[in-house]
UniProtKB/Swiss-Prot annotation:
UniProt-listed GO biological process terms: alanyl-tRNA aminoacylation
Cofactor: Zn(2+)
Catalysed reaction equations from the record: tRNA(Ala) + L-alanine + ATP = L-alanyl-tRNA(Ala) + AMP + diphosphate
Co-factor note (free text): Binds 1 zinc ion per subunit.
UniProt name for this protein: Alanine--tRNA ligase
Gene3D superfamilies, sorted: 2.40.30.130, 3.10.310.40, 3.30.54.20, 6.10.250.550, Bira Bifunctional Protein, Domain 2 (3.30.930.10), Threonyl-trna Synthetase, Chain A, domain 2 (3.30.980.10)
Keywords: Aminoacyl-tRNA synthetase, ATP-binding, Cytoplasm, Ligase, Metal-binding, Nucleotide-binding, Protein biosynthesis, RNA-binding, tRNA-binding, Zinc
Classification via NCBIfam families: alaS
EC number: 6.1.1.7
C-alpha cells in the first residue's frame, strides 16, 4: 500500500472515474438551495437528489465528485463527538461516483475493486465487504455478494447485515435499496482480525466506502425501471488508512492546522497531549468556519447563520480552555485556507471576508464570555446547593439570550462539571417565540399557493424580455381566496395568463405593473408575483366592466416604470463589479432590491466603506455609464458560465442551463478605468440594452445591516436627477437664509463658525469671571471647626467638571482649608469635598467626609484623601447635607 497525501487521494479518485466515462461535477455549495429538509449538504448525493427522483435531467448519466459536507444537526449530528472522537468531524469531504440509470451493481463493484486494489493498492487481505442480509420485505442481496467474490474477495470476508447497516432510503417515498460497505482492518496484528469487528466500535475497523444500489420504489417496494448507484468515500478516513495512522487528526489534512494552534498559543507537546480533544475540536471547527463563510454564510441568530455562530463560539470557548485569552481563530483559519485553497479556490477568493468575519464574531463573543461564564458558574453553584444535578432550562435560555451561549455550549460546560441541562425547559422558554415565528411563516405562505396548485394551471409563457405588450388569454382567476370565472368593477383579483410580458418579482427585482384590456373591461395591475414555480400571477383591480376566464386581453406593462426598474437592475450588476474592483472579490451580493425609484444592494464586507472608496465606486459607475457599453444576455450551460467567471448568487439553485447577463467593459475612457472586466452574472431579470440608458448613478447611503453585511442605496436616471435637484434646492434655501450665494456657502459657513467659536470663547471667559466673583464672595463665609478652616456652600454649576474647577479655585485661594461644595446638576445632587495637603497630613480625609454627606442625599461616593465627590437621588436634601459638614468635620478633627 502506497502512502498518499489527501490531495493525491482526491485526484486519484476523480481521475480514475473520469477515465471511466464519468463527468467531473464540481462540489456544490454547502448551502442547499430549494430543500427545506436540509440546512447543509451532508453527503455527495445531495446535489443530485432531483436527478435520482426523476425531477431533473442532466446531460450526463454518470458523474464523479469531491463534495463539501457538513454534519451538525438532525440525524447526522457529529458535533458532540468532535474532539473526543479520533474520527468525527463537522466539515468533511465526500468522494463519490454516481450512475443515473446507467451502470449498476456489476460495473459499480468492478470499478470499486479496481480502484481500491490497483490504484490505491490496498491489501486485499485486510478488506471486508458487507451486503444486505434480506428481510420479510426485501430479498438478500446475493447478487452483490457474488460480484465481490467474483472480483477476488474472500467469501469469508463478505458479510451480511440487516437494514440498520446495509439498506438505504431517501425518505418515505422515492428510490431506496441495499448498500454494500467496504471496511478495512488497520490493526497491527493481522491474526487478531475477526468478522465480529466489522460494524462494531472497534477502532481497528474503518469503513472507507459505501456503495448504494437504488433499485426499489420506497412506496411500493417494486423494482425501479432504471436503477442507479450512489457511492460515498470519506476523504478524511481514506487519508487515515493510506497514511497509516489511527486518527484522521494525524493526517496531513489536520497536522498543519493543529501545529498552527500550537504555534499561536506557544504550546509544547505535553500541553497538546494533555488537551488533545480541545486542539482537535478547534482544528475541525476552523475548517467548518472557513468553508461556511466562503459559501456565503455569516454568523447570525437564525438558521444556517446560527449554526455557524454555534461552531465558532464552541471553538472560541475551546481556545479559552487551553489558555487563549485573546482572539486566535483568524491565525488558525489562515492555515486552513493555505492548505485547502488549491482544491477549493473560493477560500482564497474570499480570504479577507473569511478572516475578518470570523475575527469579528470571535471578538464579539469574547466580550460576553466572561460574564456568561460567571453567570453559569453561579447557576451551577445554586443547582448544587439544592442537591440537584440539572440546570433549569430557563437559566440556559437566559445564557443564550443575554450572553450568546448556544445551548450545546452550556451543555458542554455543564457536562464538564457533572451536570446536565433541562432541554425541555429550555425549549419551553423559547416556545412562545417559536410559535410566533411559525405563525408568521405560515401566514406568509398562506393558502394562495395551495389554491393555485389545486387549479393545476399550465406554466405561464413569459415574453417580457422581447416585448412590453402582448396578446394573452385569461386562464385562471382568484378573488378573496376563491376561484372565479369572472369579476366586475371594483373587485380585487389575481389573474393568470397563458402568455405575459409582465415580470414577476424575483431575484430582488420587483414585479411589473400595467394594464389588462379585455373585450368587456380592464384590470389595473398593481403587482406581479410567482407563488408557484412557473406560474406568473397578476395582482390588480377591475377598473371598469368585467373580466372573465377565457377572455382575450391585451397585456401592457407600464413602460416608464419598467424602464426605471431596468436602469436600476443593470446598475446593480455594475455596482457589484465596481465594489469587487475597489474593495476586493469578497464583496459578494447578500441581497438586493431593484425598484423603480431606487436600488438597494447588500454585500459582504466587515467594515464601513471608506468615503474615498465609496467615491471611487460611484465614479467608476458613472464612467461606465458614459462609456455606453453593450448589455446582452444569452442562455448557456451553467458550467460554461462559471468557467467564464460568472457571478452566481450564494445559495441559489441553478439548472444545467442558465441565463447569463453580460455588461461589457468596453474600452477604458480617457478619464480612466471604470471596470477591471466585464460584468457577468446569472440573472433572470430585465435590463437596459446599453449602459448609457442609465443616465447617471448617485449613491445616497452606505451602512451596516448586520454582522459582516453592508448596504448601499443608490439612485439612477430620473431618481438621481430628482435627488440632485432636491439637494440643489436645499443649498439654495440654506444660502438664502444666511444671505449669500450657493457658490459662497462653504466660505460663509466657515466665517459663521469662526464667529460662533469666538463668541463662545468670550461667553466662557465671562462665565468664568462671574463664577470667580461668586466664589470670591464665598471666601468670607469660612468658619472654623475644631481649629480647621471650613468652607461649605451650595453653588451653581452645569457639570461635575465645573464643580471641580470651583473647588480647586477655592482651594488655591484659601491655601489651608476643608472645602465642601454642593450643586444640583441635571436635577441630581452632587457633592465635592477637598482637603488641603497639610490637613491630610493631620489625618483628615476627603473620602471620609463625603460618604456620610452622600448618604443624606441617598447616594454614595469616593475618591482620594485630597479630593472626593459623590452623587445622590434626593436634591431636596442637598442643603441639609451641606449643613451637616460642620458636624462631620468636627467628628473627624476632634
Amino acid at each position: 500500500m502506497q502512502k498518499l497525501t489527501a490531495a493525491q487521494i482526491r485526484e486519484t479518485f476523480l481521475s480514475f472515474f473520469i477515465r471511466h466515462g464519468h463527468t467531473h461535477v464540481p462540489s456544490s455549495s454547502l448551502v442547499v438551495a430549494d430543500d427545506p429538509t436540509l440546512l447543509f449538504a451532508n453527503s455527495g448525493m445531495v446535489q443530485f437528489k432531483d436527478v435520482f427522483l426523476g425531477r431533473e435531467q442532466r446531460p450526463y448519466s454518470r458523474a464523479v465528485t469531491a463534495q463539501k459536507c457538513l454534519r451538525v444537526s438532525g440525524k447526522h449530528n457529529d458535533l458532540e463527538e468532535v474532539g473526543p472522537s479520533p474520527r468525527h468531524h463537522t466539515f468533511f469531504e465526500m468522494l463519490g461516483n454516481f450512475s443515473f440509470g446507467d451502470y449498476f451493481k456489476a460495473e459499480a463493484i468492478a470499478l470499486a475493486w479496481k480502484l481500491l486494489t490497483e490504484e490505491f493498492k490496498l491489501p486485499v487481505e485486510r478488506l471486508w465487504f458487507t451486503v444486505f442480509a434480506g428481510d420479510d420485505e426485501v430479498p438478500p442481496d446475493d447478487e452483490a455478494a457474488a460480484l465481490w467474490i467474483a472480483q477476488g474477495a474472500d467469501p469469508s470476508r463478505v458479510l451480511r447485515f440487516g437494514r440498520k447497516d446495509n439498506f438505504w432510503v431517501m425518505g418515505d417515498t422515492g428510490p431506496c435499496g441495499p448498500c454494500s460497505e467496504i471496511t478495512m482492518y488497520i490493526g497491527d496484528d493481522l491474526s487478531q482480525m475477526r468478522a465480529e469487528g466489522v460494524n462494531s466500535d472497534d477502532p481497528n475497523y474503518v469503513e472507507i466506502w459505501n456503495n448504494v444500489f437504488m433499485q426499489y420504489d420506497r412506496a411500493t417496494m417494486q423494482p425501479l425501471p432504471r436503477p442507479s448507484v450512489d457511492t460515498g468515500m470519506g476523504l478524511e478516513r481514506m487519508a487515515m488508512v493510506m497514511q497509516g495512522v489511527h486518527s484522521t487528526y494525524e493526517t496531513d489534512l489536520f497536522v498543519a492546522i493543529i501545529n498552527q494552534i500550537i504555534k499561536t498559543r506557544g504550546s509544547d507537546e505535553e500541553h497538546y497531549h494533555a488537551h488533545r480533544s480541545a486542539y482537535r475540536a478547534i482544528a475541525d471547527h476552523a475548517r467548518a468556519i472557513a468553508f461556511l463563510i466562503a459559501d456565503g454564510v455569516l454568523p447570525g441568530n437564525l438558521g444556517r447563520s446560527y449554526v455557524l455562530r454555534r461552531i465558532l463560539r464552541r471553538a472560541a470557548y475551546q481556545g479559552r480552555t487551553i489558555g487563549f485569552e485573546r482572539p486566535f481563530l483568524a491565525d488558525v483559519i489562515t492555515s486552513v485556507i493555505e492548505q485547502m485553497g488549491e482544491a477549493y479556490p473560493e477560500l482564497v477568493k474570499r480570504r479577507e471576508l473569511i478572516l475578518s468575519a470570523a475575527d469579528q464574531e470571535e471578538r464579539q463573543f469574547l466580550r460576553t464570555l466572561s460574564g456568561g461564564l460567571t453567570r453559569l458558574q453561579g447557576v451551577i453553584e445554586q443547582v448544587r446547593a439544592r442537591g440537584e444535578q440539572v440546570i433549569p432550562g430557563n437559566d440556559a435560555f437566559v445564557l443564550k439570550d443575554t450572553y450568546g451561549f448556544p445551548l450545546d455550549l452550556t451543555q458542554k460546560i455543564a457536562a464538564e462539571q457533572g451536570l446536565t441541562v433541562d432541554e425541555a425547559g429550555y425549549e419551553a422558554a423559547m416556545a412562545e417565540q417559536r410559535a410566533r415565528s411559525r405563525a408568521a411563516a405560515a401566514s406568509k405562505r398562506g393558502g394562495e399557493a395551495d389554491l393555485w396548485a389545486d387549479l393545476d394551471l399550465p406554466a405561464s409563457h413569459f415574453t417580457g424580455y422581447e416585448r412590453l405588450s402582448d396578446r394573452a388569454t385569461v386562464i385562471g382567476m382568484l378573488g378573496d381566496g376563491d376561484a372565479l370565472t369572472s369579476a366586475d368593477t371594483g373587485r380585487s383579483v389575481q389573474i393568470v395568463l397563458d402568455t405575459t410580458p409582465f415580470y414577476a418579482e424575483s431575484g430582488g427585482q420587483i414585479g411589473d405593473t400595467g394594464l389588462l384590456v379585455g373585450p368587456e373591461g380592464s384590470v389595473q395591475i398593481e403587482d406581479t408575483r410567482r407563488p408557484l414555480p412557473g406560474l406568473i400571477v397578476h395582482y390588480g383591480r377591475v377598473v371598469n366592466g368585467r373580466i372573465s376566464v377565457g377572455d382575450q386581453v391585451q397585456a401592457t406593462v407600464d413602460v416608464v416604470r419598467r424602464a426605471d426598474i431596468q436602469r436600476n437592475h443593470t446598475a446593480t450588476h455594475m455596482l457589484q463589479r465596481a465594489l469587487r474592483d475597489v474593495l476586493g472579490e469578497h464583496a459578494a451580493q447578500a441581497g438586493s432590491l431593484v425598484a423603480p425609484d431606487r436600488l438597494r444592494f447588500d454585500f459582504t464586507h466587515t467594515k464601513a466603506v471608506d468615503p474615498e472608496e465609496l467615491r471611487e465606486v460611484e465614479q467608476r459607475l458613472n464612467k461606465w455609464v458614459r462609456a455606453d457599453t453593450t448589455v446582452r444576455w444569452e442562455i448557456t450551460g451553467y458550467q460554461d458560465a462559471m468557467a467564464r467567471g460568472a457571478i452566481a448568487l450564494f445559495g441559489e439553485k441553478y439548472g444545467d442551463t442558465v441565463r447569463l447577463v453580460t455588461i461589457e467593459r468596453g474600452q477604458t475612457l480617457a478619464e480612466g478605468e471604470f471596470a477591471s472586466r466585464d460584468s457577468l452574472e446569472l440573472c433572470g431579470g430585465t435590463h437596459v440594452n446599453h449602459t448609457g440608458e442609465i443616465g447617471f448613478v448617485r449613491i445616497v447611503s452606505e451602512g451596516s445591516i448586520g454582522s459582516g453585511i453592508r448596504r448601499i442605496e443608490a439612485l439612477t436616471g430620473r431618481g438621481a436627477e430628482g435627488w440632485v435637484e432636491q439637494q440643489a434646492q436645499t443649498l439654495r434655501e440654506l444660502a438664502a437664509r444666511i444671505n449669500t450665494q450657493p457658490a459662497q456657502l462653504l466660505e460663509r459657513i466657515d466665517a459663521l463658525l469662526a464667529e460662533h467659536r469666538q463668541r463662545k470663547q468670550e461667553l466662557e471667559a465671562l462665565r468664568s469671571k462671574l463664577a470667580r466673583e461668586q466664589l470670591d464672595l464665598l471666601l468670607g463665609r469660612v468658619q472654623h471647626v475644631a481649629g480647621v478652616p471650613l468652607l461649605a456652600a451650595e453653588v451653581e454649576a452645569d457639570s461635575v467638571d465645573r464643580l471641580r474647577e470651583m473647588g480647586e479655585y477655592l482651594r488655591d485661594k484659601l491655601g489651608n482649608a476643608v472645602i465642601v461644595l454642593g450643586a444640583q446638576i441635571n436635577g441630581k445632587p452632587q457633592l465635592l469635598t477637598i482637603v488641603t495637603p497639610d490637613l491630610v497630613r493631620r489625618g483628615l480625609n476627603a473620602v471620609q467626609l463625603v460618604k456620610p454627606l452622600a448618604a443624606l442625599v441617598g447616594g454614595g461616593g469616593g475618591g482620594r484623601p485630597e479630593i472626593a465627590q459623590a452623587g445622590g437621588r434626593h436634591p431636596d436634601k442637598l442643603a441639609a447635607a451641606i449643613g451637616a459638614a460642620v458636624e462631620v468635620l468636627a467628628g473627624q478633627a476632634g
